[in-house]
Regions:
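Transmembrane alpha-helices of multi-pass small-molecule transport proteins
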Residues: 2-7, 11-15, 41, 51-97, ...
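Hydrophobic/aromatic residues within transmembrane alpha-helices
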Residues: 52, 61, 105, 132-134, ...
Length: 329
């Protein structure tokens, strides 16, 4: 049986479908800059969080953060066209679970730098949830990137000190699980304005946080701290509400609605790099060689995850052109 020989130029279409599928997982350059800006703010925010819990109770700060996220923005942005149950799930996952646990953890149970590291387990949790719930596929280069990043995180994790407790690590892991769960809810909220989505979801964050603060921290303690609240702490809370929450989570959810979770979530692995850099610059934290080495591994992982599809596609196209030239000769 004689097989048809492809015409010259047809080989360019071989594997084109798979290449296009791979490129769907690659962020455009403007979107890359947006998400880098978001993770940079998140990283530096760990320093602000630590400064805040040194002045106010952690659950009280969390409630105030999301209260100022909700008000006054909720009066100016329309409700997103998404089910109330989706907003409920996102609001509880991000507001209560992630940040409720995270603020408690950085209040003397774990250092800000290590917290910025451990919470990145949300990347693995997000990808695992995507595989199970959405049947998303992970490419070989994405898996390799995760392994590199895990090595970098392991190096940092092996250099803990007496300022970190198992309870702090456990609470931060629960926070990471809350973040990953929030990623799943925002992933399902396709075609909505993510700014309004983030704002309206805090309707379900504030009430439980206020109740938890009243129960665990007490009305008298809350009243005493509010009476002595200074303008620096107040501005810090506003920044966490408007900059870190509305701006950054709006970007994060907006990109998750357009790209696979396996492409967006690994960018959060840069948060410890920004967090440690901000801590070194603002708090005088030292940066020994092991921290620099770990940061390099994380950056290498991000480069592989970001440019892996482009590199593979370029290699395939080059191989196809070489075969065409060989057949032509």
């Amino acid at each position: 049986m004689i097989k048809a020989v492809p015409k010259q130029g047809e080989l360019n279409t071989i594997g084109l479908h798979s290449d296009l599928e791979a490129l769907k997982s690659v962020l455009s350059y403007p979107h890359m800059l947006l998400i880098l800006c978001a993770v940079g703010i998140w990283g530096a925010n760990f320093v602000i969080m630590k400064n805040s819990v040194d002045v106010l109770p952690p659950l009280m700060i969390t409630a105030m953060r999301f209260l100022f996220t909700l008000v006054p923005a909720v009066f100016f942005v329309p409700k997103p066209k998404v089910r109330w149950t989706n907003l409920l799930g996102y609001g509880l996952s991000i507001g209560v679970v992630q940040f409720g646990c995270l603020y408690i953890a950085v209040d003397g149970l774990i250092t800000p730098g290590l917290a910025s590291l451990v919470v990145q387990m949300q990347v693995l949790f997000t990808i695992a949830m995507s595989i199970y719930l959405n049947s998303e596929r992970i490419t070989a280069y994405q898996l390799s990137a995760l392994i590199l990043a895990a090595l970098g995180l392991l190096i940092i994790g092996l250099h803990t000190d007496n300022q970190t407790s198992l309870m702090g690590v456990a609470l931060t892991l629960v926070a990471a699980l809350g973040w990953a769960s929030g990623n799943m809810f925002s992933k399902r909220a396709t075609g909505v304005n993510m700014l309004s989505y983030v704002v309206w979801s805090t309707l379900f964050s504030v009430p439980p946080l206020v109740c938890l603060s009243l129960y665990f921290e007490g009305l008298q303690t809350i009243a005493e701290h509010l009476s002595t609240l200074n303008w620096q702490t107040f501005i810090g809370i506003l920044w966490q509400a408007w900059g870190s929450t509305i701006f950054c989570y709006g970007i994060w959810g907006w990109l998750l609605a357009r790209y696979s979770a396996a492409s967006v979530a690994p960018f959060a692995l840069l948060i410890p790099v920004f967090g440690m850099g901000a801590s070194a610059f603002l708090l005088g934290e030292s940066l020994p060689l092991w921290k620099v080495g770990a940061a390099m591994l994380v950056i290498a992982a991000m480069l592989l995850n970001t440019f892996g599809a482009r590199f593979r596609s370029a290699l395939r196209n080059r191989g196809a052109r070489l075969r065409e030239l060989k057949d032509a000769n």
